[in-house]
Swiss-Prot record:
PROSITE patterns recorded: ROK (PS01125)
Enzyme Commission number(s): 2.7.1.60
Entries under InterPro entries matching the protein: ATPase_NBD (IPR043129), ManNAc_kinase_bac (IPR023945), ROK (IPR000600), ROK_cs (IPR049874)
Pathway(s) it belongs to: Amino-sugar metabolism; N-acetylneuraminate degradation; D-fructose 6-phosphate from N-acetylneuraminate: step 2/5
Protein name as annotated: N-acetylmannosamine kinase
Organism, scientific name: Salmonella newport (strain SL254)
Gene name tied to this protein: nanK
Annotated binding of ATP, by residue: 5-12, 132-139
Length: 291
């Protein structure tokens, strides 16, 4: 059965046809509408889906935000603008005329990465470090989404009670410090205004402040992983995202994790599917892998 998988992100919309063997074909991408209005997103999704829908039998969506009863929500409502409470599933069912499933993008990515692991791994956690910090948890072979879709939002656990205010309203969230956005917000002097990509370049050149910001991010993620190990007793943690997959970052996280007491150590690995993980995970779920 061919699935039309859609990935809805903050900057781009992606779609592809995925068969039962997880082969991807006919990929399409469009920019996410800057206006963040329901009409703009609806029209963009229609343009994205229309050339592909005739060859699909179902639709699977991996989206930023929280998916609750088919509607789009967020811990930080400002991130969605006018899209708060957008009827995502209903909209795609109308556009495509096909049964539709929707799940958070990090949860979907976790499910894809879980399927890439050896069969004896039943408990794993996926962490994406990018513009924000997100995650997904698989426990005893089942993806945890939670009653309200909140499960796995690890970036909104506490890192520093005296840290910066997070967009979700809490003080000192992991995301507010360790994410690409958090790193950029903390940059000062000649690094002020630099994005995370530039900070990594400058760190590679030996810039002390840039090196500190990258190191601080890695340490915060390592401490969060120790907390996750204590909470889930997971067998492994898979790291993805543009920051998480940046050169040398995973090695720094691993080094900081090794400084924690031994019971909190856990195997770390880089994401296999990278930017396709959300599409593949959503397709897997739609093709019959239950939550």
């Amino acid at each position: 059965m061919t699935t039309l998988a859609i990935d809805i992100g903050g900057t781009k919309l992606a779609a592809a046809l995925i068969d039962k063997n997880l082969r991807i074909s006919q990929r399409r991408e469009l920019p996410t509408p800057a206006s963040k209005t329901p009409d703009a997103l609806r029209e963009a999704l229609k343009a994205l889906v229309e050339p592909l829908r005739a060859e699909a039998r179902q639709v699977a969506i991996a989206s930023t935000g929280i998916i609750q009863e088919g509607m789009l929500l967020a811990l930080n409502p400002h991130n969605l603008g006018g899209l708060l409470h957008f009827p995502l599933v209903q909209t795609l069912e109308t556009i495509a005329g096909l049964p539709t499933l929707a799940v958070n993008d990090a949860q979907a990515a976790a499910w894809a990465e879980y399927h890439a692991l050896p069969d004896d791994i039943r408990d794993m956690v996926f962490i994406t470090v990018s513009t924000g910090v997100g995650g997904g948890v698989v426990c005893d072979g089942k993806l945890l989404t939670g009653k309200g879709g909140l499960a796995g939002h690890l970036g909104h656990t506490l890192a520093d009670p005296h840290g910066p205010v997070c967009g979700c309203g809490r003080v000192g969230c992991v995301e507010a410090i360790a994410s690409g956005r958090g790193m950029a917000a903390a940059a000062r002097d000649d690094l002020a205004g630099c994005d995370a990509k530039t900070l990594f370049i400058r760190a590679g050149e030996g810039h002390q402040q840039a090196r500190h910001l990258v190191s601080q991010s890695a340490q915060v993620i390592a401490r969060m992983i120790a907390d996750v190990k204590a909470t889930t007793d997971c067998q492994c943690v898979v790291i993805g995202g543009s920051v998480g997959l940046a050169e040398g970052y995973l090695e720094q996280v691993r080094a900081f994790l090794m400084q924690e007491p031994a019971p909190y150590h856990v195997a770390l690995s880089a994401a296999r599917y990278r930017h396709d993980a959300g599409l593949l995970g959503a397709a897997l779920l739609a093709q019959g892998d239950t939550l």
